[in-house]
Amino acid sequence: MAIKATDLSAIIKAQIKDFNQNVTFDEVGRVITVGDGIALVSGLNNVEYGELVQFESGVLGMTMNLEEDLVGIVVMGDDRSIVEGNLVKRMRQVISTPVGDELLGRVVNALAKPIDGKGKINTSYHAPIFKVAPGVMARQEVNEPLETGILAIDAMIPIGKGQRELIIGDRQTGKTAIAIDTILNQKGKHVYCIYIAIGQKNSTISQIVDILNKHDALKYTTIISASAAESAPLQYIAPYTGVTIAEEWMAKGKDVLVIYDDLSKHAVAYRTLSLLLRRPPGREAYPGDVFYLHSQLLERAARLNKENGGGSITALPIIETQAEDISAYIPTNVISITDGQIFTKESLFNSGQRPAIDIGYSVSRVGSAAQTKLMKKVVSSLKLELAQYNEMLAFAQFGSDLDQNTRNILEHGAKVYELLKQPQYSPYEQIKQILILFCSKYRLINPIPKAYITKYRDELLNYFLTNSKTLQVISQLTKASDWTEELIESVWEHIMAFNESFIPTIPNLNKYQGQEIPPLPWKAYKK
């Protein structure tokens, strides 16, 4: 079919109309060498440090070394598609991540791309992952508790919103379990959680996703996975992606919990990059700026003042030690950056004391200011009692001829350690914790043999939650801001009533010579 002259002229006119005279310029370089996730590129004379570049294959990279003739680029993906001579294009932007509520309940990689098969994440805003931490004047003091639901931590090593608390210990001592329990305990507390897995096995990450799903905790959690299968550059940027997502929520006044699991593997990934980029190695072959690597990350955890939104980021970094050596390079670095540490011990774990927290080594430098008065007063003497117990235990090994006072300290300390044992994935609400600790403070566990303490604790909590009179006491505790003599007497009398029903159920009790329960101090004084 012949084309008419009028049709031809109309087509030409349409093409002329759409013709664009603008010329686009791209600054490009060429790959000189590539391998081990590092590409050396020449020709990118104006590229900036930390800028994104794109290879011919579509893979992204980030500039990390700026030399006289060459640029060292870390490849954010598979470097097997890159060959010598490929063009590399400047993107004139820094690495950024999508942020927003759309990321809740999702599992993403280090670049915040979804890997959970639930479809695309449609966010309207991206934020650069490398930022300066909030300044001194933008912050306020840490004075609100972040409840972990773990009795030993909330009682003796309390964590506040905006704090950085290190979890440190050997492998397989329950570090991740503490972090996961803390996420589970945030249910209904309006705290968003971000779990960043660095160098973990994919099977472990999948297991954590299943646990959070099972306990209905995934809906307020984002999981960032940079597994052992990922390249070192992706493991390096994963924590920064996580804290950037958290900062967006903090700016909107939300409270966020960020868990870095773990920063030992993060430091190893950065060491790998630095050595491949031919940077000079320092102690333990880590580069000189490995302290700054973690300090710039953890300083972004803060509690903002009201003028800046009033939100907070609480950071729980995890560090794995070798043979309990907390004086190694990375552990000492992170201990000095954080506001305290929770030290997990293998010997405690193997003896059945779980969570295996070593109270002597563990400390919280700012969290005690965040404790409620109800909690603070029931734990006032707990750490001292356990310190005395551990000291006496060492002496008791040398001989059996102990005076009554020493035997009382040893017996009470052993019972307190039993009270502190807690099954995994079952965090306690604060009221339950207060009731348990009340029994210890006022020696209401004196007549109970050590073997029955766990049963006693569980049945006591059940008694308080199912009895109409005790539910009134729980209501009073919930509303109270501080202890009064009347409130203490009320709780004491109800626990004594429970003791009267529980003690006869203990078999062979007549063989057990337990201590008597002392009267309340003011009642003894009035007598």
Curated annotation (Swiss-Prot):
Reaction equations catalysed: ATP + H2O + 4 H(+)(in) = ADP + phosphate + 5 H(+)(out)
EC number, UniProt record: 7.1.2.2
Protein's UniProt keywords contain ATP-binding: yes
Membrane topology summary: Peripheral membrane protein
GO CC, alphabetical: plasma membrane; proton-transporting ATP synthase complex
PROSITE patterns according to UniProt: ATPASE_ALPHA_BETA
Principal subcellular localization: membrane
InterPro entries registered for this protein in UniProt: ATP_synth_asu-like_sf, ATP_synth_asu_C, ATP_synth_asu_C_sf, ATP_synth_F1_a_nt-bd_dom, ATP_synth_F1_asu, ATPase_a/bsu_AS, ATPase_F1/V1/A1_a/bsu_N, ATPase_F1/V1/A1_a/bsu_N_sf
SUPFAM superfamilies (UniProt xref): C-terminal domain of alpha and beta subunits of F1 ATP synthase (SSF47917), N-terminal domain of alpha and beta subunits of F1 ATP synthase (SSF50615), P-loop containing nucleoside triphosphate hydrolases (SSF52540)
GO molecular function list: ADP binding; ATP binding; proton-transporting ATP synthase activity, rotational mechanism
Enzyme class: translocase
Keywords of this entry: ATP synthesis, ATP-binding, Cell membrane, CF(1), Hydrogen ion transport, Ion transport, Membrane, Nucleotide-binding, Translocase, Transport
Location(s), subcellular: Cell membrane
Record function comment: Produces ATP from ADP in the presence of a proton gradient across the membrane. The alpha chain is a regulatory subunit.
Assigned protein family: Belongs to the ATPase alpha/beta chains family.
Subunit structure: F-type ATPases have 2 components, CF(1) - the catalytic core - and CF(0) - the membrane proton channel. CF(1) has five subunits: alpha(3), beta(3), gamma(1), delta(1), epsilon(1). CF(0) has three main subunits: a(1), b(2) and c(9-12). The alpha and beta chains form an alternating ring which encloses part of the gamma chain. CF(1) is attached to CF(0) by a central stalk formed by the gamma and epsilon chains, while a peripheral stalk is formed by the delta and b chains.
Protein name in the entry: ATP synthase subunit alpha
Provenance organism: Metamycoplasma arthritidis (strain 158L3-1)
